[in-house]
Amino acid sequence: MGRKNSPSAKKELVTLITNYEEAKAENRQLYLDADQLADIADWYASERKFEEAQEVITYGLKIHPGNTDLLIEQAYLYLDTQKLQKAKKVADSITEDFDSEVKLLKAELLLNGGKLEEAQWLLSTIADADELETIIDVVFLYLDMGYPDAAKEWLDRGKSRYTEDEEYMALTADYLASTHQVESAIIYYNKLIDKSPFNPSYWMGLVKCYFVQEQIDKAIEACDFALAADDQYGEAYAYKAHCFFYLNNSDDAIENYQKAIELKAIPPELGYMFIDRKSVV
């Protein structure tokens, strides 16, 4: 669900996860609010640690039965693990229909079933529809589900109010890249880098654009800048590996795939598939 976007929020989340894992390792009780447990589960799911995410949710619902945040995370976890009917059942059990996160979840389930008009109507009823956080969530939902025109409608909703806002600029860049408007996306990513040169996600935006354009040397250089900003940024290792794979540089490709697997940036089976192909060349 991507709740933790700002650097301060990410720092708080890292501390929270560290405290949770230390308490678990020591078999020590640690009381956490439902929203804290939901954030931990969300992080585990984003790292493809689905069993750990389920453990947190199960524990959370024992001490916070029926909590909306935890039920939302449970539904998304079922979606992540291709258990659509279970996800629907959990979503239907949530009583807070007015909650914007609930509406986003139910809209995703509708889009999974190809029910675009129903999803559009549901999203139009979100109370804080003109807030930037909501616009970002809805644009990415439509893009992820393959509805770029619907995404553009919501992107335009924020243009007059947020056009100079860094988060809105990042959203615009990602929209342009996702809809194959690569040159325009590059312009936006460079503007974002001028604002925040140590944000690895902006450099990764450039990487993907250059990779699509087959400007491999520029893509590798942008990967290096992303890793200079965050040497644990697994996606940069994955794309750097793809670049070396493209250049038939087996040793560097394998080294970077191994690092990407270690950081859980790509599924191990995918990484080892590339490594095996390079090993026999």
Predicted segments with their positions:
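Canonical tetratricopeptide repeat
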Residues: E73, L105, D137, L171, ...
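Alpha-helical segment of the N-proximal tetratricopeptide repeat
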Residues: E26-E55, N112, T134-D144, L171-D174, ...
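Conserved small/polar residues in nucleotide/adenosyl-binding loops
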Residues: K278-V281
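Start-of-helix register in tetratricopeptide repeats
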Residues: D35, D69, E101, E133, ...
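Structural marker of alpha-solenoid helical repeat scaffolds
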Residues: I63, S93-D97, I126-A129, R161, ...
